[in-house]
């Protein structure tokens, strides 16, 4: 809107995300259509006379709703092309920017430096890995097994020598989705590139990392670590760390993501590319919890209770150099990201009640599990 675009929004206001209907922050200057992106009638109506599309509609959760992931995420992307190709005069779309996810990369990219290799887990996030060495080099491991997680063995290991692996920045060529959500997003990337080229519709897929900031719905089980930690702390409870809290994450502010979307739309050099959108800094989940405690003014301590979440990756830090070369960089540090989210959350009604309900549902459906080794809670 600030750049002079006429904006039309299509949203089905799913109750699990928007239980009170249309959010008050939707701009009055934007045309709002109530409808479903997976409905040919609704999407066709929304596309009439449209030049550019941001496809942000998605079903996100840790629950085992496998067919829903494919229907909402991948099928709606295929339907988008189908409707445009069927009538280019009524739907003269010139470019589409798709929201993808770093989850497409699966466990990501690691280095085996050999048994006994020393140094912090972030060692090769900050420096280039050696071209030669005693280990087995760069690896792209599969997901950790249920047996490994039940035993409380959180790190990834070399399949050849058993050495603990060092995480590397994840580039856009890395793909190994292992959850239904990630598989659906990978399908979107393939549809965008193949169908976009075939029918002459430029596309860009943005792989978001852990997007944080105000307006992040806390009504579904997926909403993320910021919501989960903040709601517990504001209700006088310590933040609970899954695994041991040493997972490395890459948090990016929603406003930085919005800027990346506009750049992808307006720069032809981005056409037919997959681009990582991350915060540019590796932060452990434990460190993030401490930032959240500080922002909430709490003296509580994080607790590691031996729980883990099925489908979680161990370390996820994006290589954002490709997007940087196009002129983008993250501007909002994680500390500010946390502070502004807490300020927004304090103003929301009945937030704590939904947190408890979401965690109960994940436990009942086997998404949150407990390791079989010593389960005694530890303060870290």
Set out the residue ranges of the language-model regions.
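A conserved pocket-lining segment of Rossmann-fold NAD(P)-dependent short-chain dehydrogenase/reductase
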Residues: 138, 156, 165-177, 203, ...
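A short beta-to-alpha transition loop/helix N-cap that caps and shapes the active-site region
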Residues: 16-17, 105-108, 214-215, 284-285, ...
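Short, solvent-exposed loop/turn segments at secondary-structure boundaries
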Residues: 65-68, 216-221
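N-terminal Rossmann-like NAD(P)+-binding domain of SDR-like oxidoreductases, especially those catalyzing
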Residues: 1-208, 379-380
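Conserved active-site helix of classical SDR/Rossmann-fold NAD(P)-dependent CH-OH oxidoreductases
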Residues: 77-78, 186-193, 226-230, 259, ...
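C-terminal substrate-binding subdomain of Rossmann-fold SDR/epimerase-dehydratase oxidoreductases
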Residues: 2, 234-380
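Active-site proximal helix/loop that lines the substrate pocket
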Residues: 58-62, 101-104, 210-216, 246, ...
